Regions:
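Extreme N-terminal starter segment of soluble prokaryotic enzymes
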Residues: 9-12
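Glycine-rich phosphate-binding P-loop
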Residues: 15-28
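ATP-dependent small-molecule kinase phosphotransfer cores
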Residues: 48-113
Length: 174
């Protein structure tokens, strides 16, 4: 959309991140600097509201594997038009949650400029020319120190949590 020669399209910034790398903090700073909203876990609340599922369902399935390759390319670009089609009704719950999150991400991107942390938002918005994708990486030692400090746990425990989270995220995304 253009207004008076100025591009008025919503700008969307997606932030993928390694656990403990500071991705959420980068997202918060970016959103504050640009004066736009940040979506992270808040996206789960919105998806629950939009879909009619309770919020706990989204929290329990948040960034959990669904036998991915980005969940079979979002279920072959989900030939389910709307949520009333028979294939959707027969789908396992974790698949419905995955689709509901994607739909919410797309709705938010249409509505407003924002920063979205995680939730495969880069893939959900891959066809959006006004989407800028960022990935935050940090050395393992830095991540261990961050997680240890943020969760008030030992560095060994932090390393274990990072390894587990990295595996979960990899199977969710890949």
């Amino acid at each position: 959309m253009r207004k008076g020669g100025i591009d008025m399209a919503n700008k969307i910034y997606t932030i993928g991140r390694e656990f403990g790398s500071g991705g959420r903090e980068v997202g918060e700073k970016l959103a504050a600097k640009l004066g736009i909203k940040l979506y992270d876990k808040e996206l789960l609340q919105q998806a629950a509201k939009d879909s009619g599922f309770c919020e706990e369902i989204f929290e329990n399935h948040d960034e959990k594997p669904t036998n991915s390759f980005l969940y079979s390319l979002v279920m072959d670009t989900y030939s389910v038009s709307g949520y009333s089609a028979a294939p959707f009704l027969d789908m396992p719950l974790n698949h419905k949650v995955f689709l509901a999150q994607f739909e919410t991400i797309k709705k938010i991107a249409e509505k407003e400029s924002c920063v979205i942390v995680g939730r495969c938002a880069d893939y959900a918005l891959s066809d959006n020319p006004d989407c800028i994708n960022i990935f935050i990486h940090a050395d393992l030692d830095v991540r261990i120190k961050n997680v240890s400090r943020n969760l008030n746990i030992t560095e060994n425990k932090a390393r274990d949590i990072i390894n587990k989270t990295d595996k979960q995220r990899a199977s969710y995304y890949n």
